[in-house]
Amino acid sequence: CYFRNCPIG
């Protein structure tokens, strides 16, 4: 995951 591209984190 990176910035806010994570679906859960």
Swiss-Prot record:
Q: What organism does this protein naturally occur in?
A: Octopus vulgaris
Which residues are annotated as modified residue Glycine amide in the UniProt record? Answer: 9
Q: Which compartments is it annotated to reside in?
A: Secreted
Name the UniProt key words of this record, in alphabetical order.
Amidation, Disulfide bond, Hormone, Secreted
PROSITE patterns according to UniProt:
NEUROHYPOPHYS_HORM
This protein is called Cephalotocin
Which InterPro entries does the annotation name? Answer: Neurohypophysial_hormone_CS (IPR022423)
Family, according to the entry, reads as follows: Belongs to the vasopressin/oxytocin family.
Which GO CC annotations does the UniProt entry carry? extracellular region
Disulfide bridge positions per record: 1-6
What is this protein's function? Answer: Has a role in the neurosecretory system of the vena cava.
Primary localization class, coarse: secreted
Citing just one GO molecular function, the answer is: neurohypophyseal hormone activity
